[in-house]
Amino acid sequence: MINKLIFSITVLFALTAQAQSTDIARVEYMRIPFSNSDNSVGRFRALLQVPIPLDKELNKILVAGFEYRNVNVDIKDAVPAGFNIQDVSSLHRISAYAGYVWKFKENWRFGVKAGVRINSNLAGSLVADDWIYTASVYAINDMKDASTTKPYRWIFGLDYSTTPGRNFPLPLINYYREFHPNWTYTLGVPKTNVRHYLNGNHKDALQAFVTLDNFFANIQNNMSIDGRSAENISMTIILGGLGYEHFFTKHLLYYAYATHSISNDFRLRNNDRDDIYTINSDNTFYFRTGVKFKF
């Protein structure tokens, strides 16, 4: 029963634009000390998801989820006239969503999810541009517990959000494979990795990975820079690095990642996705650590 509940939560959160997450609960902290700059970014994140079974067999399950992120932006480099540093020093993302997962046939499940989130500096009362709406559909072929020598899982889906400048759904695909008793790999976006367990009981693991991270927030008091209006602040960063995981139980673990960016774009934009001012673009180190309960 517990495994079915965990699996249903997993598939509902697995297909978001932000992560291929299999988390049920997570608390983490991230820090970026920008290279060739005195600027830095820190982020706190907390996540919780709750299953609501609709039948005894657990073939139909509702899932409710909540996530909060706070991004602290410390800008010490010189900035152009009109750039109000205080307006972007603290950014918030508050997400709530609900989904429905049902079993189609053995080893196959389908799901839908809809949500709303606030992405804003929250300088005042909420405005229309602070709100973003999301929707996802997906199919899961899960063979992790099947009688196969190399367990695997496929996830296919489409994800749509009303993020400014993105008026089309994104296709999503994820493939997980256990190819040796102590080795697994995942292919997909935003994360591709190879994991090696350091001991037979799978208590400790190292992984090498490439991943994508980002954040976005509406600026309630738009800034005028060189005669152009900056309406939001965002960052997109592609990373490659190493991670360590310690499993307290099969599903509860501590993790720490040390990476370096391959591509980095931290900027102010308007709602047509035109760059107004680039804050940092040099490749840099990136650190993230936390505790999570996962499927």
What are these regions (language model features)?
Residues 20-126, 132-138, 178:
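Transmembrane beta-barrel domains of bacterial outer-membrane proteins
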Residues 25-27, 62-66, 112-114, 154-158, ...:
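Membrane-embedded beta-strand positions of outer-membrane beta-barrel proteins
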Residues 29-35, 66-74, 116-122, 141, ...:
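Transmembrane beta-strands of outer-membrane beta-barrel pores
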Residues 174-176, 281-295:
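Outer-membrane beta-barrel "beta-signal"
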Residues 56-62, 107-110, 144-154, 182-185, ...:
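Repeated loop/turn-to-beta-strand initiation elements of outer-membrane beta-barrel proteins
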Residues 38-42, 86-92, 127-131, 148, ...:
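Short sequence motifs at beta-strands and strand-loop junctions characteristic
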Residues 66-94, 190-274, 280, 284-287:
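Outer-membrane beta-barrel translocator/channel fold
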Residues 52-58, 102-106, 143-148, 179, ...:
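Outer-membrane beta-barrel strand-turn architecture
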